[in-house]
């Protein structure tokens, strides 16, 4: 059977002067970072582009690695997110690598109460690093890292093992 790749990124150029890049990210799936970067690189060839609108409304989140990778496209350095749990293995920090793909251009991130998890990590980290203005409603508030423990009957139990924190130390539940 053929594997179908789900497109999680839509984009268009907006504005009277066609100088705003609009990117709608529906979820943080396996290849979202590659799709997202392709759009950003295409937009950056447009010399008139003055800034970006990144729409995360009703984005339920997805893979932590994708949230980190996509956030990293807009930061030169610094912490993106950390997890803190009772066990040492559940406590980790994730950092940006050098290289802002849009060279400091302004960003507006749109969120609502349907924006959760990875969306909150992305929006919160850009806000903490003063790279974006967040507009919309309060986000969903899913600040927990969960693990599924298999049960003998074939089912599973979801257990919160740690919590996500922004560079400022605030929980991502507060985005």
Identify the role of each PLM range.
Residues 1-152:
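Cleft-lining beta-strand/loop regions that shape enzyme active-site pockets
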Residues 116, 164-166:
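Short Gly/Pro-enriched loop/turn and capping motifs at secondary-structure junctions
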Residues 69, 161-164:
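Unusually extended, aromatic-enriched hydrophobic runs near protein termini
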Residues 167-175:
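Conserved functional hotspot residues or short segments at active or partner-binding sites
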Residues 151-162:
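Short acidic, Pro/Gly- and aromatic-enriched capping/linker segments at domain boundaries
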């Amino acid at each position: 059977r053929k594997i179908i790749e789900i497109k999680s990124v839509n984009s268009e150029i907006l504005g009277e002067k066609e100088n705003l890049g609009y990117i709608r990210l529906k979820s943080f799936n396996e290849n979202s970072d590659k799709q997202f970067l392709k759009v950003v690189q295409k937009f950056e060839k447009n010399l008139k582009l003055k800034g970006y609108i990144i729409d995360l409304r009703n984005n339920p989140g997805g893979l932590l690695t994708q949230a980190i990778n996509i956030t990293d496209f807009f930061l030169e350095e610094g912490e993106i997110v950390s997890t803190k749990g009772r066990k040492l293995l559940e406590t980790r920090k994730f950092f940006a690598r050098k290289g802002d793909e849009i060279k400091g251009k302004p960003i507006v991130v749109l969120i609502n109460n349907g924006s959760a998890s990875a969306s909150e990590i992305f929006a919160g980290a850009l806000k903490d690093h003063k790279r974006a203005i967040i507009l919309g409603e309060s986000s969903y508030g899913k600040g927990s890292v969960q693990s599924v423990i298999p049960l003998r009957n074939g089912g599973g139990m979801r257990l919160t093992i740690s919590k996500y924190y922004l560079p400022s130390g605030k929980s991502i539940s507060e985005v």
